[in-house]
Swiss-Prot record:
Pathway it works in: Cofactor biosynthesis; thiamine diphosphate biosynthesis; thiamine phosphate from 4-amino-2-methyl-5-diphosphomethylpyrimidine and 4-methyl-5-(2-phosphoethyl)-thiazole: step 1/1
Species annotation: Bacillus pumilus (strain SAFR-032)
Biological process, per Gene Ontology: thiamine biosynthetic process; thiamine diphosphate biosynthetic process
Catalytic activity field: 2-[(2R,5Z)-2-carboxy-4-methylthiazol-5(2H)-ylidene]ethyl phosphate + 4-amino-2-methyl-5-(diphosphooxymethyl)pyrimidine + 2 H(+) = thiamine phosphate + CO2 + diphosphate; 2-(2-carboxy-4-methylthiazol-5-yl)ethyl phosphate + 4-amino-2-methyl-5-(diphosphooxymethyl)pyrimidine + 2 H(+) = thiamine phosphate + CO2 + diphosphate; 4-methyl-5-(2-phosphooxyethyl)-thiazole + 4-amino-2-methyl-5-(diphosphooxymethyl)pyrimidine + H(+) = thiamine phosphate + diphosphate
Superkingdom, taxonomy of origin: Bacteria
Protein name: Thiamine-phosphate synthase
Assigned keywords, A-Z: Magnesium, Metal-binding, Thiamine biosynthesis, Transferase
Length: 222
């Protein structure tokens, strides 16, 4: 990845909205539309958990969400489902440590965006070796969204990775909301990933606007 590409990814990670049907009681399309109006910079379709859509239903929703992203020039990333990402010609794929092997995903998706969730320095180094364009780090804070989550580690891993001189783009993951987002950027992350702080907000547009403004102002102070 060239320096230019890396800078672009760092910008795109600023407010990284993640959502599936399990994360909102409203129509996902309406929530995403409002979040885009509020200024999210990347979107990940994560259709997991109890009652998650399967097969054609899942693909249909993904395609509709993708169209909204395309219209707004917001990168559309698929969580774990590599085949769906290929079928839709999505902008990228995000995988966790328990998902499909990152190196295999890179071979399948070519030069599309590849993100990998990481929980320690060794996993970060492995992700870089496997060809990741960015890493998600966390859980930074306690989260209700993922029931199988690892132990909370605050921003310590982000700080550690930056101290080791690793410049891979980083997005903080897990329990991040407006009132606790600033330390994530201050520690060296390029952005924050958000689920419920937008998807369960009464006003997703306003929530996204406030998060975008916060990230922008914190980055300006660095």
């Amino acid at each position: 990845m060239t320096k230019t590409d890396q800078q672009q990814i760092k910008q795109q990670l600023s407010v990284y909205f993640i959502m599936g049907t399990a994360n909102t009681s409203r129509q996902p399309l309406d929530v995403l539309k409002e979040a885009i109006q509020g200024g999210i910079t990347m979107f990940q379709f994560r259709e997991k958990g109890e009652g998650a859509l399967q097969g054609e239903e899942k693909k249909q929703l993904a395609r509709q969400l993708q169209v909204l992203c395309q219209e707004a020039n917001v990168p559309f990333v698929v969580n774990d489902d590599v085949q769906l990402a290929i079928d839709l010609d999505a902008d990228g794929v995000h995988v966790g440590q328990e998902d499909t092997n990152a190196e295999d995903v890179r071979q399948k998706i070519g030069d599309k965006i590849l993100g990998v969730s990481t929980h320690n320095l060794d996993e970060v180094k492995q992700a870089m070796k496997d060809g990741a364009d960015y890493v998600g780090m966390g859980p930074v804070y306690p989260t209700e969204t993922k029931k199988d989550t690892r132990s909370v580690q605050g921003v310590s891993l982000i700080t550690e990775v930056r101290h080791h001189g690793l410049h891979i783009p980083i997005v903080g993951i897990g329990g991040i909301a407006y009132d606790n987002a600033a330390p994530v950027i201050q520690a060296g992350a390029d952005g924050i990933s958000i689920i419920s702080a937008i998807s369960q907000s009464a006003d997703p547009k306003k929530a996204a606007e406030e998060l975008r403004a916060l990230v922008t102002s914190e980055k300006a102070l660095l």
